[in-house]
Amino acid sequence: MDFTVKPRRSLIVYMHSMKQVRQLKRFGLIQYQSRKEHYVVLYMDESQIPAATTKIKKLNFVRRVEPSYRPDVAMNFGERVDQGFFKPTTTGAPDDDDED
């Protein structure tokens, strides 16, 4: 019995009112909700994203739906540091040794 990781992704759902948050539970796991900025982060399987997006957009309390781009971003920053992409700048405060 092998364990396989299912690819998952978040959907950011912007809403007019936060009263209907409970209706979004049937689409996936509510990972975060911001009452001040009126959005909900839903977490679900990658294969369910297209179907869920079209269904959620049809709801009258939803302003817009955006997928999360985090799975598309390469998270291996060690190679970029080795290539010199993140070079530290030496424009800081002058050293005290230069005044002598």
Swiss-Prot record:
Its main location: cytoplasm. HAMAP family: UPF0298. This is UPF0298 protein lp_2135. It holds the Pfam family DUF2129. It comes from Lactiplantibacillus plantarum (strain ATCC BAA-793 / NCIMB 8826 / WCFS1) (Lactobacillus plantarum). InterPro entries: DUF2129. The keyword Amino-acid biosynthesis does not apply. Keywords: Cytoplasm. It is found in: Cytoplasm. It comes from the Bacteria. Belongs to the UPF0298 family. GO terms for cellular component: cytoplasm. The keyword Cytoplasm applies.
